[in-house]
Structures are given as structure tokens and as C-alpha cells.
Amino acid sequence: MPTEATVAKFRPYTPDEIEAISEQLYSAYGDVQGRLLKTMARGDITSWRKAFTSQQLAQVERMLDDLNATTAFWTETHVPDLYKRGLWTADGYLQPGGLSKFAHPGEWTPMDLGMARMHDEAVRLLAENVALPLQEANSYCAQRIGDMVARAQKMAELAGKGRTIPAGLTELDYLRDTAEGQVQLRIRDASLRSMQQAFAQGMTRQEASRAFVGELQRRGVPCFIDRAGREWNMETYSSMVSRTVAHEAQRHGLQNRMVEIGEDLVEVIPHTRFKDSCDEYEGKLLSITGKSVGQTVGRRKVVASVDHARATSHLFGPNCTHSAVPYIVD
């Protein structure tokens, strides 16, 4: 077993260290979100001519393309490093001197090659877990902005014809009962509703435009809708994705190395960032494969498998900052 000094050298990244790594990506999304909002606020959105609108939307597309490149760079730089940190942490606990070794030193066996492929595949999949969701979110964001601009202009056109919502009618009543309103029936976005309300209150096109952009600034640029129907803005969604995958990369590196070596038990490290539903597993022993669940090891019980703990609590789920280390019986 390695010395205490060796183990300390190969400790997992702390939640604060992983947060700093994640922030390198999500801060870029926050910056672009601010630039997008400034682009939307420039001029009167309700009276943009087609050429000017195309110019603005082209700027939006360029910003989002740059974000895709930033995401790719962050992924290529940090995901392999985080995964290796997990490997090295396992080595520090399980290998003499913290050095990795294969089952058959001095030669490559089919098993060794298989494990090497497993590590490469794990890193590839983890990288996709960052790149694909954020690329899809950026694409959704571009489509949503274009859609909001088109709807805002249509709303201004209707208002210009004197088509305001009569007193006593709800927005939905008006949309359902007027031919022009059918075009706007699917408008449920709060920023567009703020513009619609502004027109209903007799505000000018410029005032309604400012209301629209102001509400958009308050809510952030939408880029993702989850299964519960909640809308995420660019910065909050990218921070969740980057933070979650950063923790996953380190954890999978550690667990895969342990499987490679033939070890099965991990201990969940407590953290002090905030209280969460997964705190019940702090300091508890978990089985990577599930084969050790219920066993008593070194006077401590293995309470669950890693998969069961994830399924029944928030442990190792989105935004969870817990980590695990190998459990060694002296």
C-alpha cells in the first residue's frame, strides 16, 4: 500500500478545483449570452428591415459557432486530463509507489489491450457528453432567437393595424378568436408576452421593443428545455453540463482503473459546498460492480452499488460535487 504522502499526491480534484475548470467553459457562454443580448437590444426589433435582421442573425450565428469551437477546445484539453486524474488517484491508492502496472508486466496481453481501448472509448464518450448537448443547445438557441425576432415583428405588424387585446379578454381568448391571432397562438415565451402586454397597454413600438429585450435580459437567452418543461439559459445550462461531465470524467477514470486492477470498493468523500439529497451516502462504502453489496469489509458494510446510489438519490448526478476514492482494508 502506498504511503500517506503518495496518496496525497494522487488525490482527486476538489470541488473547487473542478469548479474552476468548469468555469473556463461556462464563463465563455455567459459572455456570449451578454453579447447576444446587446445585439438584440441594438435598434428597434419591431421595425428591423429584412436586410438588417439578416445581418443581426448572422452575428448571432458567428457567436454560436465560436462557442462550438470553444467547447471543442475545452473538451479536448480537460476531459482527458480529468480522466487521467481519476486513473492516477486509483494508482496512488492501489499501486506501490503510485505507479500504474498491467496484469502482465513487460508484455501486452489481449486483456491489457482491451483495457487500453476501454479507457480511450470512455474518454471519447465523455467528450461527446459535453460537445453534443452544447452543440444542440447552441443550435436551438440560434433557431429560438430567429423565431422570436420573426414573432416580435409579426406582433408589431398586428399592433400597427390596431389589433390590440380588448379589455376583458384573455390573451388566449384573443389569439383563438381572431384570424391574425392564430399566427401567434403558440407564443408562450415570457419575453414575447411582455411585448404583447406592452402593446395592449398602448405603448409605442419602441417601448414594446424595450420591454421585450428587458425581459429577455432578465431571463437569459434560452437554449434548452428539460423533461420537466423548464427552460435553461445559456450560462446555467453550460455550467451544469461542464461541471457534471468534469466530475464524471474523474470518477470514471478512477472506477475503470479499479476494474482493471480487480478492486471493487469506493468510499464517498464528504464535501462542504452545500447540503443535498445525496449527503446520505457521505462516508459510505459502495460497490462498483454491485457484487460486494451487503458484505462487511473491515467492520464496515457495503451499503449499495454505485448505480443504485445514483438511481435512488442525486449522488453523482447533475451538479453533484461528491467524489469517491478506493477503499483499502489495512
What are these language model-derived features?
Residues 1-224, 328-330:
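N-terminal leader/targeting and assembly helices and adjacent pre-domain segments
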Residues 227:
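Electropositive, gly/pro-rich neighborhoods at or near active sites that engage anionic ligands
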Residues 223-224, 232-330:
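Acidic, glycine-rich two-metal-ion catalytic cores of nucleic acid-processing enzymes
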